[in-house]
UniProtKB/Swiss-Prot annotation:
MF term (GO), any: rRNA binding
Record-given protein name: Large ribosomal subunit protein uL5
Annotated keywords: Ribonucleoprotein, Ribosomal protein, RNA-binding, rRNA-binding, tRNA-binding
Assembly and interaction partners: Part of the 50S ribosomal subunit; contacts the 5S rRNA and probably tRNA. Forms a bridge to the 30S subunit in the 70S ribosome.
Function description: This is one of the proteins that bind and probably mediate the attachment of the 5S RNA into the large ribosomal subunit, where it forms part of the central protuberance. In the 70S ribosome it contacts protein S13 of the 30S subunit (bridge B1b), connecting the 2 subunits; this bridge is implicated in subunit movement. May contact the P site tRNA; the 5S rRNA and some of its associated proteins might help stabilize positioning of ribosome-bound tRNAs.
GO cellular component annotations of the record: ribonucleoprotein complex; ribosome
Amino acid sequence: MAVEIPNKEQILADWEAHPMRRPRIEKVTINIGVGESGERLTKAEIMLQQLTGQKPIRRKAKKTNRDFGIRRGEPIAVKVTLRGPKAYELLKRLLAAVDNRLKASSFDEHGNVCFGIEEHINIPGVEYDPEIGIFGMDVCVTLERPGFRVARRKRKRAKIPTRHKLTKEEGMVYMMEEFGVEIVEG
């Protein structure tokens, strides 16, 4: 069942009147947690590079976990961060893999959204390769407003005021308007 956002019209009117308040995609981060190093991690790395056209980085285990046979510092995951038009185009394909539906609980209080893809072969344009196998992945979309650079720059750094931060509802409205996503309860 689709979720109705009560102040959707008000948010859209605010963006129309103030273009600097309209959100945009800062980055899209794709993570594949394999849970082990070796051949399977290398295959995940190859698959992620084919999907994004960018070289992924390896993520290391923070703690030793004997039950899973993981040592601290051992590479167990790969991730890639996309920005700009590349991120926008890939996000369209990734949303198609989940039928353009996102849970309301997938959004955090700052409007960012994360969702999972169970099998990478669900993404349009991706063929099954028996050499690589099938991998699932986590996709995190970070949204920002124009002007967020003041928090990251080296000189004259400043905090983002609360009134300029994104809300959960604004993140939902942005995804609905920009990508035609249906937000469901959950």
